[in-house]
Amino acid sequence: MDYKQWVREFKKELAHEIEKELVAEVDDNIQRGFQKKELKWKPLSKDYQKRKEKEGRNTKGLIYHGALLKATDSKVKITSKGLQVKVFNNMVYAGVHEFGSKKKNIPARPFIQPALKKVQKDLPKIVEKVIKRMR
Protein backbone atom coordinates (compact mmCIF):
# COMPACT_ATOMS: atom_id res chain seq x y z
CA MET A 1 0.00 0.00 0.00
CA ASP A 2 1.45 3.37 -0.96
CA TYR A 3 1.35 6.46 1.24
CA LYS A 4 -1.78 8.00 -0.32
CA GLN A 5 -3.69 4.74 0.02
CA TRP A 6 -2.55 4.43 3.63
CA VAL A 7 -3.75 7.97 4.41
CA ARG A 8 -7.15 7.29 2.81
CA GLU A 9 -7.51 4.05 4.75
CA PHE A 10 -6.35 5.74 7.96
CA LYS A 11 -8.94 8.53 7.62
CA LYS A 12 -11.66 5.96 7.00
CA GLU A 13 -10.65 3.79 9.97
CA LEU A 14 -10.22 6.82 12.23
CA ALA A 15 -13.59 8.29 11.29
CA HIS A 16 -15.37 5.03 11.99
CA GLU A 17 -13.54 4.53 15.29
CA ILE A 18 -14.47 8.07 16.41
CA GLU A 19 -18.06 7.39 15.32
CA LYS A 20 -18.15 4.15 17.32
CA GLU A 21 -16.72 5.84 20.44
CA LEU A 22 -19.11 8.81 20.18
CA VAL A 23 -22.23 6.70 19.74
CA ALA A 24 -21.20 4.44 22.63
CA GLU A 25 -20.60 7.44 24.91
CA VAL A 26 -23.89 9.14 23.94
CA ASP A 27 -25.77 5.89 24.57
CA ASP A 28 -24.01 5.41 27.91
CA ASN A 29 -24.94 8.96 28.95
CA ILE A 30 -28.58 8.30 28.06
CA GLN A 31 -28.60 4.98 29.92
CA ARG A 32 -26.83 5.98 33.12
CA GLY A 33 -26.25 9.73 33.11
CA PHE A 34 -27.50 10.25 36.67
CA GLN A 35 -24.76 7.89 37.90
CA LYS A 36 -21.99 9.73 36.04
CA LYS A 37 -20.83 12.49 38.38
CA GLU A 38 -18.89 14.25 35.62
CA LEU A 39 -22.18 15.08 33.85
CA LYS A 40 -23.44 17.02 36.89
CA TRP A 41 -27.08 16.45 36.02
CA LYS A 42 -29.71 17.87 38.31
CA PRO A 43 -31.48 14.87 39.92
CA LEU A 44 -35.01 13.87 39.01
CA SER A 45 -37.72 15.45 41.12
CA LYS A 46 -38.65 13.25 44.07
CA ASP A 47 -42.17 12.72 42.74
CA TYR A 48 -40.95 11.70 39.29
CA GLN A 49 -38.26 9.47 40.81
CA LYS A 50 -40.88 7.69 42.93
CA ARG A 51 -43.23 7.31 39.97
CA LYS A 52 -40.48 5.79 37.79
CA GLU A 53 -39.47 3.41 40.58
CA LYS A 54 -43.09 2.38 41.16
CA GLU A 55 -43.50 1.68 37.43
CA GLY A 56 -40.24 -0.29 37.37
CA ARG A 57 -38.63 2.23 35.01
CA ASN A 58 -34.95 3.14 34.69
CA THR A 59 -33.87 5.87 37.13
CA LYS A 60 -30.19 5.85 36.17
CA GLY A 61 -30.61 7.75 32.91
CA LEU A 62 -32.96 9.35 30.42
CA ILE A 63 -34.80 6.17 29.54
CA TYR A 64 -38.55 5.88 29.84
CA HIS A 65 -39.64 3.83 26.83
CA GLY A 66 -36.19 3.59 25.19
CA ALA A 67 -37.05 5.73 22.16
CA LEU A 68 -34.37 8.34 22.92
CA LEU A 69 -31.71 5.64 23.05
CA LYS A 70 -32.88 4.08 19.78
CA ALA A 71 -32.89 7.47 18.02
CA THR A 72 -29.14 8.10 18.35
CA ASP A 73 -27.68 8.18 14.86
CA SER A 74 -24.40 9.11 13.23
CA LYS A 75 -22.92 10.13 9.92
CA VAL A 76 -19.34 10.09 8.62
CA LYS A 77 -17.98 12.29 5.83
CA ILE A 78 -14.43 11.83 4.56
CA THR A 79 -12.85 14.27 2.10
CA SER A 80 -9.35 15.02 0.89
CA LYS A 81 -9.21 17.84 3.44
CA GLY A 82 -10.24 15.81 6.48
CA LEU A 83 -13.06 13.95 8.11
CA GLN A 84 -16.30 14.81 9.80
CA VAL A 85 -18.21 12.69 12.28
CA LYS A 86 -21.71 13.73 13.35
CA VAL A 87 -23.76 12.20 16.13
CA PHE A 88 -27.34 13.33 16.56
CA ASN A 89 -30.67 12.33 18.00
CA ASN A 90 -33.91 12.78 16.06
CA MET A 91 -36.35 12.52 18.95
CA VAL A 92 -38.45 15.65 19.32
CA TYR A 93 -37.58 15.95 23.00
CA ALA A 94 -33.84 15.27 22.65
CA GLY A 95 -33.18 19.02 22.55
CA VAL A 96 -35.17 19.53 25.74
CA HIS A 97 -32.96 17.02 27.53
CA GLU A 98 -29.77 18.44 26.01
CA PHE A 99 -30.54 22.13 26.67
CA GLY A 100 -33.42 22.14 29.16
CA SER A 101 -36.71 24.03 28.96
CA LYS A 102 -37.47 27.07 31.10
CA LYS A 103 -41.08 26.98 29.90
CA LYS A 104 -41.57 23.41 31.18
CA ASN A 105 -39.14 23.80 34.11
CA ILE A 106 -36.94 20.96 32.84
CA PRO A 107 -33.24 21.28 33.63
CA ALA A 108 -30.62 20.66 30.95
CA ARG A 109 -29.22 17.15 31.09
CA PRO A 110 -26.81 17.15 28.17
CA PHE A 111 -25.84 13.77 26.77
CA ILE A 112 -24.34 14.63 23.37
CA GLN A 113 -22.02 17.56 24.18
CA PRO A 114 -20.30 15.73 27.09
CA ALA A 115 -19.77 12.71 24.82
CA LEU A 116 -18.17 14.94 22.21
CA LYS A 117 -15.85 16.51 24.80
CA LYS A 118 -14.85 13.10 26.16
CA VAL A 119 -14.06 11.70 22.72
CA GLN A 120 -12.10 14.86 21.84
CA LYS A 121 -10.07 14.37 25.01
CA ASP A 122 -9.53 10.69 24.15
CA LEU A 123 -8.59 11.44 20.53
CA PRO A 124 -4.84 10.73 20.94
CA LYS A 125 -5.67 7.26 22.32
CA ILE A 126 -8.13 6.65 19.49
CA VAL A 127 -5.55 7.66 16.87
CA GLU A 128 -2.98 5.37 18.49
CA LYS A 129 -5.47 2.49 18.51
CA VAL A 130 -6.19 2.92 14.80
CA ILE A 131 -2.49 3.16 13.89
CA LYS A 132 -1.73 -0.04 15.83
CA ARG A 133 -4.60 -1.82 14.12
CA MET A 134 -3.32 -0.76 10.68
CA ARG A 135 0.23 -2.06 11.21
Swiss-Prot record:
> Would you tell me the protein name for this molecule?
Uncharacterized protein MJ0331
Q: To which species is this protein native?
A: Methanocaldococcus jannaschii (strain ATCC 43067 / DSM 2661 / JAL-1 / JCM 10045 / NBRC 100440)
For this protein, the record's Pfam families field holds: Phage_tail_S
